Amino acid sequence: MSRIGKIPVQVPSGVDVDIADRVVTVKGPKGTLTHRVPAPIVVARGDDGALVVTRPDDERTSRSLHGLTRTLLANLVTGVTQGYQKNLEIVGTGYRVTAKGSSLEFALGFSHPVTVSAPEGITFAVESPTKFSVAGIDKQQVGEVAANIRKIRKPEPYKGKGVRYAGEQVRRKVGKAGK
C-alpha cells in the first residue's frame, strides 16, 4: 500500500467537493479547481467527509498513480483554501521589475524591456524593484509561471546575476585567474 496514497485528504469546512464521472471538483473561498482521476484509481468520500483514494490492484501503473492522485487532490484543497505563492528576487546591477497593471515589466540587461502578462488565475505582487511574487490557487500553474519568469534570465554561475527563487542557492564558479 502506498504510504502517501492511503492517507485520507481532510476537507475543511467551507470547502465543497463534488465527485462525478471520474472528475473531482473542489470549490472553496478562493475559487474552484477540477482534476480528472486516472482510470484505475477510485476516489470516494470517507465516513468523516475526507477524500479516500484507493486502487483496485497492485499493478505498477496503479501503484504509481495512487500516491500521485492523493497528493494532487490535497493540492486542490490547499489551493482553494490558502492558495500558493512563489517569491522571486532579482540580483544584478540595473536589473529591476515594475508592475504595469496585471503584468510585470523586467529590465534584465537586454536592449529592450521584457513584459510578462499574468495568465488567468495568477496575480503578481511587486514588493521592491528586486523582489516580487507569483500567486494563485493552482500549484502547477503558479510554479510554471514562476519558472518561465526565471528562465528569462537564469542566475549565472560567475556573478550570480539573474532571476532566482527567494532563498535559492546558486552554484558559483571561480573565474579564470588573471595575470
UniProtKB/Swiss-Prot annotation:
Pfam families: Ribosomal_L6. Keywords: Ribonucleoprotein, Ribosomal protein, RNA-binding, rRNA-binding. GO terms for biological process: cytoplasmic translation. It comes from the Bacteria. The keyword Chaperone does not apply. The keyword Ribonucleoprotein applies. One of its GO terms (cellular component) is cytosolic large ribosomal subunit. Transmembrane segments: none annotated. Gene3D superfamilies: Ribosomal protein L6, alpha-beta domain (3.90.930.12). GO terms for molecular function: rRNA binding; structural constituent of ribosome. Belongs to the universal ribosomal protein uL6 family. NCBIfam families: L6_bact (TIGR03654). PANTHER family: 60S/50S RIBOSOMAL PROTEIN L6/L9, LARGE RIBOSOMAL SUBUNIT PROTEIN UL6M. Part of the 50S ribosomal subunit. This protein binds to the 23S rRNA, and is important in its secondary structure. It is located near the subunit interface in the base of the L7/L12 stalk, and near the tRNA binding site of the peptidyltransferase center. This is Large ribosomal subunit protein uL6. It comes from Beutenbergia cavernae (strain ATCC BAA-8 / DSM 12333 / CCUG 43141 / JCM 11478 / NBRC 16432 / NCIMB 13614 / HKI 0122). The gene is rplF.
